[in-house]
């Protein structure tokens, strides 16, 4: 059983992923924006992060860069977006994202 942090500003996405992952036996924590994700990461490191790209306060790529610069990128991160670009996927992967899930 893994602890998974779901970071997405859309409540429906957070709820859906939380339900699916919980049903599979995982512990799911949610953050509705980058600041909540920062706060959570400072308290503990999840086993996996599902990170949205487009959020109102700070985008997911910027948050990924912050974690990498602060040596806090110690867990796998899968980037998510319904409005992805190839360039964004490549950038996130170069920073340290494990994978990128989205429609191009």
Where in this protein do the model-derived segments appear?
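The short loop immediately C-terminal to the conserved phospho-acceptor aspartate in CheY-like receiver
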Residues: 10, 53-54, 79
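Two-component/phosphorelay signaling modules centered on CheY-like receiver
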Residues: 11-29, 42-43
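The feature encodes the CheY-like receiver
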Residues: 14, 56, 70, 81, ...
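Acidic catalytic/metal-coordinating carboxylates
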Residues: 32-36, 59-62
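Short amphipathic alpha-helix used as the core "switch/output" element in two-component signaling
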Residues: 39, 61-73, 91
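Active-site beta3 strand of CheY-like receiver
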Residues: 44-50, 55
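His-Asp phosphorelay/catalytic-motif detector in bacterial-type signaling
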Residues: 45-47, 71-76
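Alpha4 helix (beta4-alpha4-beta5 surface) of REC/receiver domains from two-component response regulators
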Residues: 62, 84-99
